[in-house]
């Protein structure tokens, strides 16, 4: 038993819970049982882990995760935020923790897993040099301005609440975390991501709703990004 894992929780918010049984099966298989799981929006429990089930009263991604993260940080100094539509591999958790230890003196904000359904350099399809069927870059930790925390670890000190929107909430949060003096990193860890199972596949709707909020509340950022 690793006593340090008793001070760590995996935090999930869900609306439909379509993929939650598979995620929980992978947590049960690959995550030490000392880690607590906190899920908002479902009564489903992991079979091997202490599971705390909460309501999900948020109207969007930002509100839903803010609520459950605040709850978790009342008990835990650091948490792993997980999307409800990912699947862990045998090394997802272990590599994330190993990389966090390696970066312990780097003013760590987000440290997030790579995936097959994610934008930018966090996607495993990015790379220049092959090593067998993988890219060499997949075995490297690197810094990034903006990340998608599909499976990412963060401390209570570094956390900043999401804006109350679906799209762009993680972009804005990452920028604010960097402005507060922390650095965001991509881990060597990998998770499979189904994608868009909670916010839906109507990309135009998600884009328009987020842009409307940003324009009304963060006009300078709106003009920088979208004008």
Task: Report the location of each language-model feature.
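Short, acidic, metal-binding catalytic loop of nucleotide-sugar glycosyltransferases
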Residues: 25-34
């Amino acid at each position: 038993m690793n006593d340090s894992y008793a001070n760590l929780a995996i935090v999930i918010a869900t609306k439909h819970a379509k993929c939650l049984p598979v995620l929980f099966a992978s947590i049960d298989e690959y995550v030490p049982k000392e880690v607590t799981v906190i899920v908002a929006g479902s009564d489903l429990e992991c079979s091997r882990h202490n599971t705390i089930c909460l309501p999900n009263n948020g109207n969007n991604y930002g509100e839903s995760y803010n609520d459950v993260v605040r709850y978790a940080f009342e008990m835990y100094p650091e948490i792993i935020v997980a999307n409800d539509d990912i699947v862990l591999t045998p090394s997802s958790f272990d590599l994330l923790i190993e990389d966090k230890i390696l970066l312990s003196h780097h003013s760590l904000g987000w440290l997030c897993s790579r995936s097959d359904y994610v934008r930018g350099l966090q996607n495993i399809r990015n790379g220049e040099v092959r090593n067998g069927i993988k890219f060499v870059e997949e075995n490297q930790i690197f810094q990034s301005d903006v990340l998608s925390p599909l499976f990412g670890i963060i401390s209570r000190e570094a956390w900043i609440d999401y804006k109350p929107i679906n799209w762009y909430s993680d972009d804005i949060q990452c920028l604010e975390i960097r402005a507060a003096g922390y650095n965001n990193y991509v881990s060597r860890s990998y998770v499979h991501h189904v994608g868009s199972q909670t916010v839906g596949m109507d990309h135009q709707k998600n884009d328009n709703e987020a842009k409307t909020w940003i324009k009304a509340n963060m006009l300078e950022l709106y003009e920088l990004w979208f004008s």
